[in-house]
Amino acid sequence: MNHAITMGIFWHLIGAASAACFYAPFKKVKHWSWETMWSVGGIVSWLILPWAISATLLPDFWAYYRSFNASTLLPVFLFGAMWGIGNINYGLTMRYLGMSMGIGIAIGITLIVGTLMTPIINGQFSVLMHTQGGQMTLLGVLVAVIGVGIVTRAGQLKERKMGIKAEEFNLKKGLLLAVMCGIFSAGMSFAMNAAKPMHDAAAALGVDPLYAALPSYVVIMGGGALVNLGFCFIRLAKVKNLSVKADFSLAKPLIISNLLLSALGGLMWYLQFFFYAWGHASIPAQYDYMSWMLHMSFYVLCGGLVGLVLKEWNNAGRRPVSVLSLGCVVIIIAANIVGLGMAS
């Protein structure tokens, strides 16, 4: 496995670790509605940071975006909005299926759809099926899905042991939402594929290849922001017990604390895709579709490890922790299989 591929896998791991931790600051926000908190974090992660970093990287910010026609920008924006719909469905999936089953089904589906649909759309799938490297990377996807399934099983054992149940368990509704969440969340992978002309244009302007994908986030995350912020603003306007005015009528120190914590959560959310761009740039072009598989499987891996560090599994017993450990090992094996496949 060469150095570039190793670093690509490493950067995806760092990005996934940030994704697994980003909600921790949000949990410390007090006396704010989820909608206000999520909006503040979202404005930082989907609007301020993509625009600020792109303005820093590009020699002429507006000229860069004006150089693309609508046929290039619209699919990128719409795939970003597609991801935004999946993001909203994610929370509803947890509500009706519980954390473990919801995460397992939604992440498993988005891993498969987001990874495999890209080479199918690009007409590369048959080539992958008939080359040694392609076969190994596809095997890595299968092993990763198995690893996600094992971690999901560990979560179910933990929830059963600790008496944790879904807020409003509804298998039929939950499964439908999990499938929708898995498919729509893959929009981020499709958006990155559609944004390749934007990446190439940024590189042609002298932007370092590691950063070349970042200017496309203005459009991708703009689509996601439209859906997420629209959802939050509509609820804040229509739901009687939600009030932005009330949220900002708290004591000034608490408002400042909530703003900083929400902004920190937004920063950590953005960093997952900052490092995703680095990992994506380090992987051979013919295997760039594997970025999504690495990100999502490492997300599950890091989520399990973060749970152990935060002692969320302390009262779960030995068996759930053993199953979790096995799942984490399987995901690590999957990443190595993918790395060897890309290097062959």
UniProtKB/Swiss-Prot annotation:
This is L-rhamnose-proton symporter. It catalyses: L-rhamnopyranose(in) + H(+)(in) = L-rhamnopyranose(out) + H(+)(out). Keywords: Cell inner membrane, Cell membrane, Membrane, Sugar transport, Symport, Transmembrane, Transmembrane helix, Transport. GO terms for cellular component: plasma membrane. Belongs to the L-rhamnose transporter (TC 2.A.7.6) family. Its main location: membrane. It is a multi-pass membrane protein. NCBIfam families: PRK13499.1-1 (NF010021), PRK13499.1-3 (NF010023), RhaT (TIGR00776).
